[in-house]
Amino acid sequence: MLVLARKVGESIFIGNDVEVKILKIDGGEVKIGISAPKSVRILRKELYEEIMAENKKAIEFDIKDISEVSKFENR
């Protein structure tokens, strides 16, 4: 992990087209602005983890469920 110190108004670039800028520091909260192409997905970590958990649940299955579906195919 790369750790950098930045002041308000300073920024970093990730690759050639993603800029992360420090907008405001207030107590324990840091406000950042991110400029990136629309093709770059930007998510808060907690939202990303929630999406990944839902995706994992969506691909889990019980073998009983498959046998139930096969009953409909035989009609």
Curated annotation (Swiss-Prot):
| GO BP annotations listed | bacterial-type flagellum organization; mRNA catabolic process; negative regulation of translational initiation; regulation of bacterial-type flagellum assembly; regulation of carbohydrate metabolic process
- Pfam families recorded for this chain? CsrA
Q: List the disulfide bonds.
A: none
User: Which of UniProt's keywords are assigned here?
Assistant: Bacterial flagellum biogenesis, Cytoplasm, Repressor, RNA-binding, Translation regulation
| Subcellular locations according to the entry | Cytoplasm
Cited InterPro entries: CsrA, CsrA_sf
MF terms from GO for this chain are:
mRNA 5'-UTR binding
Entry GO terms, CC: cytosol
**UniProt main location, coarse:** cytoplasm
Q: How does it assemble?
A: Homodimer; the beta-strands of each monomer intercalate to form a hydrophobic core, while the alpha-helices form wings that extend away from the core.
Functionally, this protein is described as follows: A translational regulator that binds mRNA to regulate translation initiation and/or mRNA stability. Usually binds in the 5'-UTR at or near the Shine-Dalgarno sequence preventing ribosome-binding, thus repressing translation. Its main target seems to be the major flagellin gene, while its function is anatagonized by FliW.
Family classification = Belongs to the CsrA/RsmA family.
The protein, known as: Translational regulator CsrA
